[in-house]
Amino acid sequence: MNKTITFILAFFFAITASAQVSNEDLDVKYAASLLPAGTEVPDMLVDTTINLRLSDMRGHYVVLHFWASWCPDCRKDMPEMEKLDKRYDCFEKKGNEVAFVHISYDGDTARMNRYLSEHALNGYRLCQGRKFHDTETARLFGVKWIPSMILIDPQGRVALSTVMVDKLKKALQHLDLSKLDPNAPKAVEMPEFQGGTDALMNYLVQNVHYPTKAMEMGLQSKVRVSFVVDTLGQISDLKIKENNLSAVRKAPISKLNPEERQRTAKECATLFANEAKRVVRSMPAWKPARSFGKKTKVSFMLPITFRL
């Protein structure tokens, strides 16, 4: 009987101890060194390619996420961080007012990118190239534990410093949108054909030439062309991402034997692709994309429909 009582007491103690650990505020132990709420955040370079600095993002909420792929706790929190990034990040959805800056302490960018190839993070990504103890970002923001997260308000002050992703989630759910600066540069401005969408449609109508062979065979296609618009608005790196052939009713191609039909369809698919690339390549310069007012190079996808 005594042994049974001892076992029950020990079991009860174990449950109680476990509950205390699970309910512990980890910020007390691990976030004490982070910049406290109300502190004006120091400036830092966010994107070297467009010389974007943290101070350029004033007027918007910003999340600094300090992490590394070698960190077990970071990997544990990554699914929730992905959800927050997808839900709130300004690059994911127009109208979102939070910019995520993911600062990695991996040894090199390749290692970080290998990990992120399986984890979708839409915001800015910085790789420090070494452990956080030896970095300027850790010194500036007081990072002594990862993952760490700092939510910055539109006035450039710390709204929350934490090592707990659940606290960040709650803070993002209750953002004070009245603090946003309506005059601040937009987080994302996509590239635009000069004159806008109507001008682009008119350009395509006037300049796309239907391939003669495809017309004779009664073939149509919807081609999706991807290309890069650089900071000068110039187009490069054209790629055909989709080329869906279809035939009109009683199309002449249907009268060909299977071998000829296959060869002709392949030939016409190439003609559609080449014409789509030709008309895109011949476009005048676009209005370049901007991120927080800075011109930036981005990829763009354009569908071109060939229909009889």
Regions found by a protein language model. Give the residues of each.
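Bacterial Sec-dependent N-terminal signal peptides
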Residues: M1-E24, S69, L175-P182, L204
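Conserved redox-active cysteine motifs that mediate thiol-disulfide chemistry
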Residues: G59, F66-R87
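N-proximal helix/coil linker or "cap" segments that precede and/or mark the start of modular domains
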Residues: S18-D43, S55, A110, R114-S117, ...
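Thiol-based oxidoreductase modules, predominantly thioredoxin-like and allied folds used
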Residues: K93-R111, L121-F132
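Charge-biased low-complexity segments
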Residues: T6, L151, Q173-L308
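A short beta-strand-turn-helix
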Residues: P42-V62, K86
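Short, internal strand/loop/helix patches
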Residues: N113-P154
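Thiol-/selenol-based redox modules, centered on thioredoxin-like
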Residues: S22-D25, W145-I146, L151-P185
